[in-house]
Amino acid sequence: MTIESTNSFVVPSDTKLIDVTPLGSTKLFQPIKVGNNVLPQRIAYVPTTRFRASKDHIPSDLQLNYYNARSQYPGTLIITEATFASERGGIDLHVPGIYNDAQAKSWKKINEAIHGNGSFSSVQLWYLGRVANAKDLKDSGLPLIAPSAVYWDENSEKLAKEAGNELRALTEEEIDHIVEVEYPNAAKHALEAGFDYVEIHGAHGYLLDQFLNLASNKRTDKYGCGSIENRARLLLRVVDKLIEVVGANRLALRLSPWASFQGMEIEGEEIHSYILQQLQQRADNGQQLAYISLVEPRVTGIYDVSLKDQQGRSNEFAYKIWKGNFIRAGNYTYDAPEFKTLINDLKNDRSIIGFSRFFTSNPDLVEKLKLGKPLNYYNREEFYKYYNYGYNSYDESEKQVIGKPLA
């Protein structure tokens, strides 16, 4: 397998540039221990869905080149992308999975490249729930499932009914299967693939977050009834089960307290304080997670939030409860070139800063931040295409190139 040189990524000449003040002398480039590993700097690539796997969910040669390029600076933590934990968890074309041997073998080749660069890897386990594609699931004989039969918008209801795959609530037996079989199977394959960490996606309106949120959880059993303890029960069960599988020091969790993405209501401090208290109790008993990835209130899903709408929202409550590491992510470039917010947030010695959108257009982002080189602005129009154009290359011929499975 040939891996492309990082020098082959040339953006269009009219790409907007963002000026950067050199950050090499800041805490951003000081080491931090994450689980059993010491990262020599505090920059993480946080997950970006890009649809470049093969159509049957096997990581591709395009992804190998992509992650190799973004792990070139030693010690970078690469959290690959949202990755299906099971077939029932989602079946969108060209999204990678980590639930079978072929997928694990392909991810292993990507991890070998990341580790060969002296960097680290984490996989984000994804379960879509009510925002999955009803027709694609129907075509594979799979149900559209959620905490409750509450669609996230009118169009999703229309499409589900047209597909003959209407949304229904998970049974308690199905929930047990998700906890005891589906997530552990994905986590075991992640270990076989060589990932350093396994991150549970508990944010942005996907299945585990749907249980947390009153807009999507109308259950009347032990997973609902409006109580915080019940709504957080599934998430904490998944955490506890995966601690058994991968070990706490290799396990992580992503949360988005202020997101209102995909029909969700803002959850805020209350339920997330409870979750963090529960995780801290586990840490106090020797089961501390590697990190918690927390989305800043500057972002909700794929959208930036105005300064006006951010008022009264802060993640400071979380840093007072959880004493372990945080990955803090969400539009840290908004005050470039000075990056005052980033520098201030690093005063908390347990913080790593996550970037995603600007990593898509700057494979050498870490070096640019260190040396103060301008950043290429990202091209959102090419985020969710299947071809290589806008991913590893801006050569027009790459619009004909689709990823080939690595295994």
Swiss-Prot record:
Reactions mediated catalytically: A + NADPH + H(+) = AH2 + NADP(+)
Top EC class of this enzyme: oxidoreductase
Active site: 206 (proton donor)
SUPFAM superfamilies reported in the protein's UniProt record: FMN-linked oxidoreductases
Site (May interact with the steroid): 225
A GO term for molecular function: NADPH dehydrogenase activity
Superkingdom in the source lineage: Eukaryota
Protein family membership: Belongs to the NADH:flavin oxidoreductase/NADH oxidase family.
Function: Oxidoreductase that binds mammalian estrogens with high affinity.
Name recorded for this polypeptide: Probable NADPH dehydrogenase
Lineage: Eukaryota, Fungi, Dikarya, Ascomycota, Saccharomycotina
